[in-house]
C-alpha cells in the first residue's frame, strides 16, 4: 500500500511511518522538516490547506494517517490553530478524498471525555471541558469509508524534549510519584501502528475505541516502564492526590485485532527500542 503519514516526525508519527515502511509499504511523510527515516518527505506546514490538497490530489495514496495535533497547553495558548488542526483538518481530509480510494485514519484521544463519569464507549457523548478536549472532539470523523481510532498513547520519542509520559519517566532518577487514582486505558504507539495496518487490511471504518477493555492506573503503568526500561532502579511512590478515570471501552466486535495486555505492550515497546537504538540515544536503558 501507498501511505501518507501527516506529522511523520512526532512521537506517534515517526514510529507509525517507520513501522509501515518496515512492513514493505511505500510510505511518504509530511512534516515541517524532512524525516531521516523515510525516502520521501513532503516538507510543509499542515495549516497550508492548498498544499495538503495538492499532495492528496497528486499522491494516489491508499491511506492517509493523520498524526497531526496541537496538544494540551499548546492548544490553550493557540486556539485558532487548535481549531484548524485538531478540529477542521480531519474533516477537510475526508472532504477532499470523498471521490478517491484514499482512506483517512485519524487519531483521537481519551481527552474528549472529562474523566468523572467513565467508562466511555464509542457512542458516549464527549464532555471534556478544556479547549484541547473540545477541539479534539470536534475533529472525530465517523463515516463508512474512513476511520477514527480513539485512544490514549504512550511510546518512545525521537525528540529528547518530547512531552509524553514515557519521555518524562526516562529522564527521572531516584524517586518519582505515581498516581494511583489516575485510571488509564491506552496503547503503545507500536500497538497502534500494528492496529492501523490491520484496520486497513480489514477495511475497518467509523469510530473505534482501540483498547483492551481493561484499565490500569498510572502508578502501575510507571511500574511497567520501570521493569522493562530501567531495571527497577526508580523508586515509585504511590500518590492518591489525582482522581481521574478516562477509561475507554469498546462495544464493537467487527475488528480482528486484539490489543495485548499492558505488560505485553510495554515488553514489545522495549523490543522496538532495542531494534532501533540509533533513534533513541537519549534513553538510559538497563
Predicted region positions:
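N-terminal Rossmann NAD(P)H-binding glycine-rich loop of SDR-like oxidoreductase domains
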Residues: 3-23
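Rossmann-fold cofactor-recognition segment
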Residues: 34-48
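NAD(P)H-binding glycine-rich loop region in Rossmannoid oxidoreductase-like domains
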Residues: 44-87
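Glycine-rich NAD(P)-binding loop of the Rossmann-fold in SDR/ketoreductase-type enzymes
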Residues: 77, 81-92, 126, 130, ...
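Conserved Rossmann-fold NAD(P)-dependent oxidoreductase catalytic core, especially the SDR/UDP-sugar
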Residues: 91-127
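NAD(P)-dependent short-chain dehydrogenase/reductase
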Residues: 129, 141-191
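Mid/C-terminal beta-alpha module of Rossmann-like enzyme folds, strongest
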Residues: 193-245, 277-286
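Amphipathic terminal alpha-helices
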Residues: 260-286
Amino acid at each position: 500500500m501507498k501511505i501518507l503519514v501527516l506529522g511523520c516526525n512526532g512521537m506517534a508519527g515517526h514510529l507509525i511511518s517507520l513501522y509501515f515502511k518496515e512492513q514493505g509499504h511505500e510510505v511518504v511523510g509530511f512534516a515541517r522538516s524532512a524525516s531521516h527515516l523515510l525516502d520521501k518527505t513532503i516538507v510543509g506546514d499542515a495549516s497550508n490547506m492548498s498544499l495538503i490538497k495538492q499532495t492528496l490530489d497528486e499522491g494516489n495514496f491508499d491511506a492517509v494517517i493523520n498524526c497531526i495535533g496541537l496538544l494540551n497547553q499548546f492548544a490553550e495558548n493557540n486556539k485558532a490553530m487548535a481549531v484548524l488542526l485538531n478540529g477542521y483538518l480531519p474533516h477537510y481530509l475526508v472532504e477532499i478524498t470523498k471521490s478517491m480510494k484514499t482512506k483517512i485514519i485519524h487519531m483521537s484521544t481519551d481527552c474528549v471525555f472529562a474523566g468523572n463519569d467513565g467508562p466511555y464507549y464509542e457512542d458516549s457523548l464527549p464532555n471534556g471541558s478544556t479547549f484541547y478536549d473540545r477541539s479534539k472532539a470536534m475533529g472525530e470523523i465517523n463515516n463508512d469509508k474512513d476511520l477514527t481510532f480513539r485512544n490514549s498513547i504512550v511510546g518512545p520519542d525521537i525528540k529528547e524534549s518530547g512531552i509524553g509520559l514515557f519521555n518524562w519517566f526516562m529522564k527521572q532518577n531516584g524517586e518519582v510519584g505515581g498516581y494511583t487514582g489516575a485510571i488509564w486505558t491506552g496503547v503503545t504507539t507500536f500497538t497502534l501502528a500494528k492496529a492501523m495496518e490491520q484496520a486497513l487490511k480489514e477495511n475497518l471504518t467509523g469510530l473505534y475505541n482501540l483498547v483492551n477493555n481493561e484499565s490500569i492506573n498510572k502508578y502501575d503503568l510507571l511500574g511497567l516502564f520501570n521493569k522493562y526500561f530501567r531495571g527497577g532502579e526508580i523508586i515509585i511512590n504511590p500518590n492518591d492526590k489525582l482522581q481521574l478515570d478516562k477509561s475507554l471501552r469498546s462495544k464493537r466486535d467487527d475488528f480482528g485485532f486484539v490489543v495485548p495486555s499492558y505488560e505485553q505492550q510495554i515488553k514489545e515497546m522495549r523490543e522496538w527500542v532495542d531494534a532501533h537504538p540509533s533513534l533513541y540515544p537519549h534513553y538510559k536503558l538497563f
